[in-house]
Amino acid sequence: MKNFNFSIHERADYNLKIQKDLDIIKKIIVNRVEDVLNIILVGGFGRGEGSIILFENKIIPINDYDFVIITFNYLSNKIINDIKKEILNQVGIRQIDIVNIQKKNLKKIKNSIFNYDLKYASYNLYGDTKIYELIPSINSKMSFDEIKRPLFVYLSALLLSFPKKQNYSLYSTIEKFWVFQQITKSILGWSMSKLCFINNYDPSYKNRNLNFQKFFKDNSDECKLVDIATSFKLNLTINIPKNLEDIWHINKKIHLDTLFNFYNKRNIF
């Protein structure tokens, strides 16, 4: 796949930085895994919406790189963890996520958000792209378990963004950046659940925002938060909104209310 943009910016220097990282990662995996068939980049970078920032003249990918490694044989957790350690030692990234799928199990892949993204919104870094043909068609209509998953997965982001110093004004610029990043994860999580509930899942952050503004236009606070979170995700900046505390409290209420209503088996939307 040529001329792939790993972020929405379509900048040659951004793509070069990511590609250099991926070349190192590919070499490490191929050297360590004898029967590797494919290395697939999933997540934001895999669908051309990776979070990246230019800070103090340095190009910095934010969050993590997510990979699916296709092999003939099962990879143990030890092997995967050893690969992660080597990658983290050589590449300037906060975290590496690796999922191993055996070739024989591709045909058994079930309907899920992760598998939908793997099939339709990923970047094949290494191996024959015909491997995708082994993955069955996946419906964008998700099960109830999948709908609720983002509410729980990103609940941790809500907790991590809690103002431990009791006042966000005491935070440094960098601290505010990471706090706001966690807040936006929470926002993107509950908004994805709402879209899944109406059978409107889309891998793209940009498309999700457009769909949310369309289908939930009567929920002005929610629409505003989703727009803010999406803009930050795709166009990272160190300049964080001044009303950070207000955003946290509004978001907390929406996230927890959605979760509460879900558990009480009411219409959460």
What are these regions (language model features)?
Residues 220-239:
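Histidine-centered, metal-coordinating catalytic motifs and their short helical/loop contexts
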Residues 26-65, 70-75:
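Active-site nucleotide-donor binding segment shared across nucleotidyl transfer reactions
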Residues 46-47, 193-195, 201:
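Short, solvent-exposed loop/turn segments at secondary-structure junctions
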Residues 1-34:
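N-terminal regions immediately upstream of nucleotidyltransferase
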Residues 242-243:
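Compositionally biased, intrinsically disordered linkers/stalks adjacent to structured regions
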